[in-house]
Amino acid sequence: MWKFNKKLARLTYRLYSSSGPSSPLHGKKKLPQNLKFVVLNPTQSGLVKNDQKQPRHRPSKKRSHKETGDNNLDFGSKLLVFEKQNSLDSALNSIRLKKPTSASLPSLEYNALLQSLTSSYNRYQLREFISTHQPDSSSHLTHWKKSKLSQYIIEKIWNCQPISTPTTPTGIKSTSLTFQFDSPREIFLLLITQNGKILTNFNKLGLTFIISIQDNELTVKGSPSLLKYAEISLNKIWSNITHENVRMYSLMPSKDVINLIQKETHTFFEYLPDLQMYKISALSTKKISMAKVFLLNAVASNPNTTQHHHTIASPALKTELYPFNNTLENLDWLNKSQDWARLQSVVPKNCTDLMTPTENATPELTDAQVSQFESSLSKNIPSLSPSDSISQSLSITLGHSLQSASFSSIFQPLIHKSFISKLLNLPMYKESSSSAVPVPVPLDQHLITNAHQSFIQLNFTPVPPTSGSSSSPFLQIWFEIDEFDNIVTTSMRPLLKLQENSVILRTPQCQTDYKITSDYIQDLLPDFDQTNPDAWLSEQKGLQEFLLKSHWKLNKYQNLMKKINISLPDNLIQQYQLTDVLTHRVLNLRFPTNTAQDDKYIIQYSDISRGFLNNGSYRQLDFINVNPSETSLKTFINDVLSF
């Protein structure tokens, strides 16, 4: 028993005592008429610290079982005990069933049985099985390995011995099974499907596979019972192979591209020269559909796209190609398999000043170069007409101009770390309040407060027509994503890429290259009108079907319609195939200028995630000219180069 705290009792009595108005305790709660004592434990009364552990009262298990009248409440724990007690019996019975019917085993069957016992059971189960047959032998089995225990079971308990397997005149053992094919299709699908998981599972059973690529021959070695199982299983797998012929309308893809598609989609391609077609084979129709998308994505080239390269560097500057190391994180599936390099300046070893003027000097453009850029960006441009919803977009993207060993070149968007510090102090761009002076808020605070916008971009490639006609423009469909990662279907914007001209500026003396892009796009739909929603898709039945039949879940691209029919402005119906899906998280920042017109440029920071065909993500920084007609191209380029 703990001692009564007299000081605490006197203080309680004073607080609850009856006092007059002149008392210093006036207004306190009075002591109740029927005084009752509340017994506190040592912790509640403050006599024991909170960190001191007190013994807890735990009721007896026997008492708790007596108080519960329903025995079914503890039925689950009894089931667990029952299962635990019988797990060893199940293992012993499983080992007992593996006993061969014959005492003489071929060497392959003996090795397969030995491997099965070693890999399927632990040492305790094997020792207990031996103890059930030889109780006196358990003492010297404690430190034996599983392989030795398994061998002891086969030879000492089951009295089985390995014998040499007779061979045929051809040299092939009698415990083997040979499959002969006309093409390497069946063997190739076994090797590539699920990265060879099918053959790996067979190998775990004790089967050995010998493949002859020149003869299209597959030989399986093992015990007779396992060979029978392998024969039935392999024939069942090969019976699921489906085929589809795909006609090629454009240039034939290279052999490397075909091999890459086969690897990515687990399919097999056979070229039929008489029909000018590819015969695609796979173990499922979904893999064939995916292979067709990869093939279309690889061979389809946009005829409405032009690209020119210009190197801006001093003739005295020495440049070399340096390897690009971020291929896995940034490049897509088609370019990821190649080695890329960027043109960079070379600093002499005897140079003591690392911050040389040549490296950090802003590239200077001449009027002749700017005139050449304008000529390249204005090729094949359509006539701008507000009635046709055709608009122009002029932007400059930061990145690297890369070259491969085959002299092909690409531009990969990339943000160098030297630009991050400049972005952190830029204010956010707000179109509604462009005239007001914004309060600068750092970039990281924008991202934390969820000030960015999210979009999903669906890229569609026109399916080649059966008759020779003019090529249709590529299609992009954009959707907004709300704060709950739900796609807002009423924000759909289908855009036709009428023309895309770009000029890539290679600047070896700088940390990044620049891509100047002039886009001409046409919007196929007006803005959604809530007062008249039926008129929104009245002229685009294909888009209406696309919205109704697609199940919109972010990162669940298999639920989208892969093909849609679009009514083009020239009253033609064109079928499009979905080839890629990109997710954008966009943040618009204001470009710092010293002029009164402070809203002529927008800096767009994008975090882009690939999906559908590609994996990975990359970050992109674009400088967008809001009014290309009001700002000259030379001024725009010089402003971006001096950023």
From Swiss-Prot:
Belongs to the SLS1 family. Residues 55-65 have a biased composition (Basic residues). It is found in: Mitochondrion inner membrane. One of its GO terms (biological process) is mitochondrial translation. Keywords: Membrane, Mitochondrion, Mitochondrion inner membrane, Protein biosynthesis, Transit peptide. GO terms for cellular component: membrane; mitochondrial inner membrane; mitochondrial nucleoid; mitochondrion. The keyword Transmembrane does not apply. Residues 43-72 are annotated as: Disordered. InterPro entries: SLS1_C, Sls1_KH-1, SLS1_KH2, SLS1_N. The keyword Cytoplasm does not apply. Its main location: mitochondrion. It comes from Saccharomyces cerevisiae (strain ATCC 204508 / S288c) (Baker's yeast). Present with 3430 molecules/cell in log phase SD medium. This is Sigma-like sequence protein 1, mitochondrial. Involved in aerobic respiration where it is required for assembly of respiratory chain enzyme complexes III and IV. Also has a role in mitochondrial gene expression. May be part of a mitochondrial membrane-associated RNA-shuttling system, delivering NAM1-associated transcripts to the translation machinery.
